[in-house]
Amino acid sequence: MIIIPAIDLFDNCAVRLFKGNYKEKKIYSSEPWKLAEGFAKNGATLLHLVDLNGARNQLGINEDSILKIRKTTSLKVQLGGGIRDKEKLAYYDKIGIDRFILGTAAVTDPDLLKFALDNYGKERVVVAVDAIDGIVKIAGWEKDSGVRYRDLMDRLAKAGIEHIVFTDIAQDGTLAGPNLKAYQEILNSYPFQVIASGGISSLKDLMDLSSLKTKIPLYGVITGKALYEGKLDLAKAISSI
């Protein structure tokens, strides 16, 4: 299980939201590329980068920060937020993004999902399944899709998706701990390589996730707020798992 530090970009700053609420955001840095450099020095290998403006269809706002992060860090980068057409995929491929995260498009545009798989391969395509009360949220978590996350996962498995990020929005940004039951059910029911996201607050949370009794082990865990608030030491976490 790998530990994946997160940077969420809003207006070119690193921020964290509380339960996905844009009105409850806290700014942690106006130089997010420096955060990425620090994560690399502490032993991370993969960065989870989210364009929050892009997720709300406010395109291009964080472009400079995304480019600078890509140019200044040795980390592999998986990027999501607003990837809803072939042109955006091609652009991110051109600037060296390693993995593309599709969220809204995975629900609303199965043709784009197939295009991404066919042209970039299963290892580079990740689907974000973001849910609250069992229902998938889209468009920056501001709209209900009307689709239950288990139904979406059934579709993704049939489409050949191998990698997903599952976020329990009710836990995200709360430091209240992960939804262990949900991850256990998913890992026992589907063939995905699953990355957990939402609620991580301590090394104990990571240990609890890594020790889940499941058919497939958890692939990785995303953590953001716990790092920024000093609740979790990245180097220690990486060496302990």
From Swiss-Prot:
* Residues the record marks as active site: 8, 130
- Catalytically driven reaction(s): 1-(5-phospho-beta-D-ribosyl)-5-[(5-phospho-beta-D-ribosylamino)methylideneamino]imidazole-4-carboxamide = 5-[(5-phospho-1-deoxy-D-ribulos-1-ylimino)methylamino]-1-(5-phospho-beta-D-ribosyl)imidazole-4-carboxamide
Q: Which GO terms describe its molecular function?
A: 1-(5-phosphoribosyl)-5-[(5-phosphoribosylamino)methylideneamino]imidazole-4-carboxamide isomerase activity
Sorted keywords for this record are: Amino-acid biosynthesis, Cytoplasm, Histidine biosynthesis, Isomerase
Give the matching Pfam families: His_biosynth
Pathway as given in its UniProt record: Amino-acid biosynthesis; L-histidine biosynthesis; L-histidine from 5-phospho-alpha-D-ribose 1-diphosphate: step 4/9
One GO CC term, this protein: cytoplasm
Give the enzyme's EC designation.
5.3.1.16
- State if Cytoplasm is listed as a keyword: yes
Origin, by domain of life?
Bacteria
Instruction: Tell where it localizes.
Output: Cytoplasm
Q: Extract one GO BP annotation from the record.
A: L-histidine biosynthetic process
* Entry annotated with the keyword Transcription regulation: no
Question: What HAMAP family does the record point to?
Answer: HisA
Say which family it is in. Answer: Belongs to the HisA/HisF family.
Output this protein's name.
Answer: 1-(5-phosphoribosyl)-5-[(5-phosphoribosylamino)methylideneamino] imidazole-4-carboxamide isomerase
**Species annotation:** Leptospira borgpetersenii serovar Hardjo-bovis (strain JB197)
